[in-house]
Structure formats: C-alpha cells, structure tokens
Regions:
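Contiguous segments within soluble domain cores/interaction surfaces
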Residues: 1-99
Length: 99
C-alpha cells in the first residue's frame, strides 16, 4: 500500500462472517498496533470483508517497513477465530501529508 492514499482492502474469507458479533482488522508495524478497524467500519458480505483506510491512517505507517494485518472475529455461537497474518509494505510518496 502507498502512504497518503485511501486504499480499499478486500479480504476473502472461507467462513461467513456476516452474522459475527465482533470483527477486528488489526494493522501492526514495528511491534506496535498502528491501526484497528472494527464494525461498523468494515463492510461484511458472506465471503468478503471490505475496509477503506484514510490518508491519515496510511501516513501513520513508516516507509518501506513491513505491515502485518490480521482479522479476528467473535462468532454468534461464542467461537473466537483469527486469520493467518498477512504482510505488506508501506510504500513511499514524494509529497508528504494529506492532500
């Protein structure tokens, strides 16, 4: 992802999370949680989770360092689940700041 942009992240799931009680998408960099999205900021379909980040949120990531992403959910039957960790990089931009 590029810093200073407003990317939409779509995560495909093999479990229908449309009836989950809680869903969190956590973004971690350098050992610290930088960002966490939760309902209602996440659009949920039977097969996808969709979340859009703001310019401010993507600017909070350090350049060219790994960003770990993980989804956790609490299903309506009380079962807690977690995805594998996804890794991406925050790419640089030439003009810093929000536009």
């Amino acid at each position: 992802m590029r810093r200073g942009t407003t990317p939409t992240h779509e995560f495909t799931t093999d479990i229908d999370l449309s009836t989950a009680d809680k869903i969190y998408i956590t973004y971690k960099q350098g050992g610290a949680v930088k960002l966490e999205k939760a309902l209602p900021d996440i659009t949920v379909t039977p097969t996808k989770l969709i979340v859009t980040l703001t310019q401010e949120e993507t600017l909070s990531f350090s350049i060219n360092k790994g960003v770990e992403i993980q989804i956790r959910a609490l299903l309506n039957n009380g079962e807690a689940i977690a995805s594998n960790v996804i890794t991406t990089t925050a790419q640089k931009i030439l003009k810093e700041g929000v536009i």
